[in-house]
Structures are given as C-alpha cells and as structure tokens.
C-alpha cells in the first residue's frame, strides 16, 4: 500500500 511504499522510501533514505 501507499504507506508501505512511503515507509520503504524513508527506510532507504535512512539507510
């Protein structure tokens, strides 16, 4: 879902 995509994006940037 959208929320999952956003969380994944934030996690990637935080990586």
UniProtKB/Swiss-Prot annotation:
The record's subcellular location field reads: Secreted
Function recorded in the entry? Has antibacterial activity against a wide spectrum of Gram-positive bacteria including B.cereus, E.faecalis, L.lactis, L.innocua, M.luteus, S.aureus, S.epidermidis and S.uberis. Lacks antibacterial activity against the Gram-negative bacteria E.cloacae and E.coli.
Cellular component per GO, a single term: extracellular region
Tissue expression summary: Expressed by the skin glands.
Keywords of this entry: Amidation, Amphibian defense peptide, Antibiotic, Antimicrobial, Secreted
Q: What is this protein called?
A: Signiferin-2.2
Q: Name one GO biological process term.
A: defense response to Gram-positive bacterium
The PTM Leucine amide maps to 15
């Amino acid at each position: 879902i959208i929320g999952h995509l956003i969380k994944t994006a934030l996690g990637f940037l935080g990586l």
